[in-house]
């Protein structure tokens, strides 16, 4: 059975405990389709807190378990700093190919 086309999801603004459930829902909807790839664009995200990071880690684990490649691009500013401090940049796929998702 052929897998669905790659999914592209963009987020913007501040991702925090107040709205990370919406992020989780959008990622979950894409993951349920079981596409070969999901590109997540964070280029318009100004900040992210631990709940947003946890959502990205959870989505990455789910994607890996089902054979989907989840790439996170457009990382900059506070988001890039926090990923580096937490070393999540070594766990999450921040491939350059997802920079313009």
Question: Can you annotate each of these PLM segments?
Answer:
Residues 1-51, 57-101:
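STAS-like cytosolic regulatory interaction modules
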């Amino acid at each position: 059975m052929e897998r669905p086309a790659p999914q592209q999801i963009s987020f913007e603004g501040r991702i925090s405990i107040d709205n990370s459930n919406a992020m989780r829902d959008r990622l979950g909807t894409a993951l349920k389709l079981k596409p070969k790839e999901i590109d997540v664009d964070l280029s318009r995200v100004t900040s992210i807190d631990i709940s947003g990071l946890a959502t990205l880690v959870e989505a990455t684990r789910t994607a890996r378990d089902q054979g989907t490649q989840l790439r996170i691009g457009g990382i900059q500013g506070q988001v890039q700093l926090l990923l580096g401090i937490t070393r999540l940049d070594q766990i999450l796929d921040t491939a350059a190919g997802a920079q313009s998702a």
